Structures are given as C-alpha cells and as structure tokens.
From Swiss-Prot:
Keyword terms, alphabetized: Acetylation, Heme, Iron, Metal-binding, Oxygen transport, Phosphoprotein, S-nitrosylation, Transport
Single GO MF descriptor: heme binding
Modified residues (Phosphoserine): 45
Chain positions with Phosphothreonine modification: 13
UniProt-listed CDD domains: Hb-beta-like (cd08925)
N6-acetyllysine modification, residue list: 60, 83, 145
Pfam families: Globin
Annotated organism of origin: Callimico goeldii
Tissue distribution: Red blood cells.
Keyword Metal-binding: yes
InterPro entries, A to Z: Globin (IPR000971), Globin-like_sf (IPR009050), Globin/Proto (IPR012292), Hemoglobin_b (IPR002337), Hemoglobin_oxygen_transport (IPR050056)
Protein's recorded name: Hemoglobin subunit beta
Signal sequence extent: none
Length: 147
C-alpha cells in the first residue's frame, strides 16, 4: 500500500496520462541494463546486449519495457492493494526467474530519472516525491514473495 495525499495522487495520475508507455518502458529497461550491466543476465535470450547502443535499440528490450510499464500502469490503478496486484509477478520473479529483488528498486529509480528527462520542468519536486513513493511501493510489492 502506498500512502499518497490527494495532491500526490493527482500529480501521479496527471503525469502518467501523458506517458508514452512504449517509449518510456523501453528506455527505462534499457537504461537499467546499461547502468547496471549485471541485470543483463536475466535477459540473455534477448540477443545483442553488447553495448549501450545495442541495448537501447534492441527490440526485445523495448517490448519487455513496454510490458513492464503496462504492469506498472495497472499498479497505479490499485495503489491500495499493490501486494495483491503484483502477487503473481512477485512469485514469478522469485520462484522461477530468481531475480534479486534489489533490481526492482533500481528499475524504479531509473524510471523516475527517465520520467524527469522526458517531462523536464513538469516533473516538479512534488511529482518526483510522489513517484518515489509509488516506485518504492511497487518494488516492495514485487519483493513480497521473497520475505
């Protein structure tokens, strides 16, 4: 559960309504794989990840980034039940994929940076603080199965 004020909820939903999920999803996942290269081990089937350019232009990275942000979008409509919303994904990432739950926090922080880059002055400190709460809540929900 994420506790947001009315102003914070409004800031999150207003900005999210302007997000191009295809573009931002691919960029966020790509940046995660470039900045934290050890995360690439979970994506060996994606083909060429040999350079930042290869990662950022990889169609499988872009497609999976879109899928990730689709799930994030779903979470935004269930802020009061993030653990329930992400229960199946938590189980998948824990039991089958064996993803280090710290990676969820890293991806959330990368997403905040990508949103700041895309929205510039519109990504105010208030908006950033609200998104930091949301990505922390999502990361916690995704890590829930690990506890």
């Amino acid at each position: 559960m994420v506790h947001l004020t009315g102003e914070e909820k409004s800031a999150v939903t207003t900005l999210w309504g302007k997000v191009n999920v295809d573009e931002v999803g691919g960029e966020a996942l790509g940046r995660l794989l470039v900045v934290y290269p050890w995360t690439q081990r979970f994506f060996e089937s994606f083909g060429d990840l040999s350079s930042p350019d290869a990662v950022m232009n990889n169609p499988k990275v872009k497609a999976h980034g879109k899928k990730v942000l689709g799930a994030f979008s779903d979470g935004l409509t269930h802020l009061d039940n993030l653990k329930g919303t992400f229960a199946q994904l938590s189980e998948l990432h824990c039991d089958k994929l064996h993803v280090d739950p710290e990676n969820f926090r890293l991806l959330g922080n990368v997403l905040v940076c990508v949103l700041a880059h895309h929205f510039g002055k519109e990504f105010t400190p208030t908006v950033q603080a609200a998104y930091q709460k949301v990505v922390a809540g999502v990361a916690n929900a995704l890590a829930h199965k690990y506890h």
